Structures are given as C-alpha cells and as structure tokens.
C-alpha cells in the first residue's frame, strides 16, 4: 500500500482595507472556508473607506471570523499546519488587527507564521482556477494598484509597468462620486457603461508612450471638467454615456499596454486579478482580444467571488511560501507601503 501524503492546512487572514476575512486553505488550491465580513455599509455614507472606522470593524469581527472559518471547514487548531497573514500594503491600523491576530494564533498553537504581500494574494486568487505555468504575466488592477507583473516562477515578481498616479479602481470611485453613484462605484459604473456609448472620447493617457506604465489622473480630470462644464451651462448629459466613455478609456489603455508587454515578454499565461478584475467590460475585452493576438497565451480570470479582498487568496500565496519555509516571527509588523520585493530570489 502506498503512503498517503499529508494535507497541508493554512489558516489565512486578510484585513488590509475594509474586509475582514479568515479562510482555511488546503494544499494551496482548495478552499475549505472563506469567511468575509464586509464594511461597505459603514463606509458608504462617507463615500470611501475611513481608516479609523475600518480598524474598529476589524477588531469587532476578527475573532468571529476565525471561529466561523474553522467551523465551516470542520477543522480545529490542532489540524492546522501554518498561519498566513497579509502584512501589507494597506491601511496600517487595519493591517495591524490581522497581523496581531495571526501572531497570537501562531504563538498559542506553535504554528509557523507566513507574512504575505496583499498584491501577491490577488494574483494567487487565480490559482484556484488552475495551476500556474511560467513564465506568466499578471494584470493587477485594484483600488490602490494598477500593475503589470512578470513571474518566472512561484514567488518571483517583477513589476514591468505601474500607475504613475491614480490606480484604475481609485478613478472609478472618484468619478462615481461625481455621478452620484454610492461607494464602491465600480460595479454600478460597469453596468451603466454597458447601457451607454463612448460618445465623449475621453483621453487615453500614455497609450502611445514607449513604456508599460499607466496614468488615470488626466482621465479623471477630463471627466470632472466635462460634467462641471455641462452643469454651468445647464446642459444635461447622459450618465450611461459618461460611464461608457470613462470605461472605454480605462479598458483601452489597459488592453493596449497589456498586449504590447506580451510582445516583449512572451508568456504561457496571462492572469487578470484585483478588485477591478471583476469588471465585465475588461473581462470581455481580454477574452475577445487576447486569443486573436496571442493564441498560445492562456487567459486566467480570477473568480468573481475572489476578485475583492479575501483570506483565501492569502492562503494560496502563503502556501507557496510555506513550501519554501519563508516564515516570519514574533517581530512581524504591518508594512502599509510594502512593495513587490518582499521575497527577492526565493526560487533562484
């Protein structure tokens, strides 16, 4: 009789912004539980995330989420092999709640502690769809980041292009306020865009520049100026057309840069991840344009339910570090400005 390999169970924490999430992940690719306590209703009246409010909610929810995650997965602390936690980037107060909870569990139950980069977690949300094949390019689009990340192996990240000002998700929320769309605005604007037409032809910043960086501040300004000018002269603008024109500009730039980078960096897979990866307009364009331009590059879209912040993605990224004994200790602290050089040369 052959031996049965032990299953590795990781308890994973995510608290970088406005979701408190704890998950139990088996072998890096199977979700046994993924409990998420969202704070959207608390932040909606402010039109965005208020750090102090976020921290308070994390404190209230973290223990409840831990208990629910273990119960839903039908496991106990004794069954766990490690604890993974987002330690950056994000809101420092919010991060500290998750980091301290994870450190407490790891210490109390003598488990290895795995510090995970939040943005790596977003990429590894796509790992639940299928195994990664390298080299790989990730288009990472979220509220705080817009990046093209090249991976030659698990745990190795090279930023090829990034935003020079506003991230795409940030621009969505800002123009959402102008349109009177409640926070978070991304999903509603996406729906409005599908009902409208690109009639305003907003600028596509940096689309022809010889680099892979992004800029969305000019688009945001053009949008706001268009709306304000209409208000001043008493003109009525179609909000669906405004949304469609804004989204067309964002998607055109993301697509142009992504297809261009794939010419210089041939890859086996392209991963779309991050909160804005839930955008149907962007998903549709990638599904339409990538096969025509790069038929040998496989597109992996992060599952819709895992595009937002969640513990499962942290467990998936953490499992890679677990396999290579990339552990933290009791001195682990939150790093709100953490960048992608978090594991230099892990798999040389």
UniProtKB/Swiss-Prot annotation:
Q: Which residues hold substrate?
A: 140-144, 173, 186, 190, 279
- Biological process according to GO: tRNA threonylcarbamoyladenosine modification
The EC number(s) attached to this protein equal: 2.3.1.234
Compartments where found: Cytoplasm
Provide the residue positions that the database annotates as binding Fe cation: 118, 122, 309
Q: Which GO terms describe its molecular function?
A: iron ion binding; N(6)-L-threonylcarbamoyladenine synthase activity
Keywords annotated in UniProt: Acyltransferase, Cytoplasm, Iron, Metal-binding, Transferase, tRNA processing
Domain of life according to the entry: Bacteria
Answer whether the UniProt record assigns the keyword DNA-binding to this protein.
no
List the record's Gene Ontology CC terms alphabetically. cytoplasm
As its record notes, the protein acts as a catalyst of: L-threonylcarbamoyladenylate + adenosine(37) in tRNA = N(6)-L-threonylcarbamoyladenosine(37) in tRNA + AMP + H(+)
Q: What class of enzyme is it?
A: transferase
Q: What is its main location?
A: cytoplasm
Which coenzyme or cofactor does it need?
Fe(2+)
The family database entries (InterPro entries) matched by this protein are listed as:
ATPase_NBD (IPR043129), Gcp-like_dom (IPR000905), KAE1/TsaD (IPR017861), Peptidase_M22_CS (IPR017860), TsaD (IPR022450)
> CDD domains, from UniProt?
ASKHA_NBD_TsaD_bac (cd24133)
Cofactor annotation remark: Binds 1 Fe(2+) ion per subunit.
Main function:
Required for the formation of a threonylcarbamoyl group on adenosine at position 37 (t(6)A37) in tRNAs that read codons beginning with adenine. Is involved in the transfer of the threonylcarbamoyl moiety of threonylcarbamoyl-AMP (TC-AMP) to the N6 group of A37, together with TsaE and TsaB. TsaD likely plays a direct catalytic role in this reaction.
Q: Which family does it belong to?
A: Belongs to the KAE1 / TsaD family.
PANTHER family per UniProt: TRNA N6-ADENOSINE THREONYLCARBAMOYLTRANSFERASE, TRNA N6-ADENOSINE THREONYLCARBAMOYLTRANSFERASE, MITOCHONDRIAL
Record's protein name:
tRNA N6-adenosine threonylcarbamoyltransferase
Name of the gene this protein is made from: tsaD
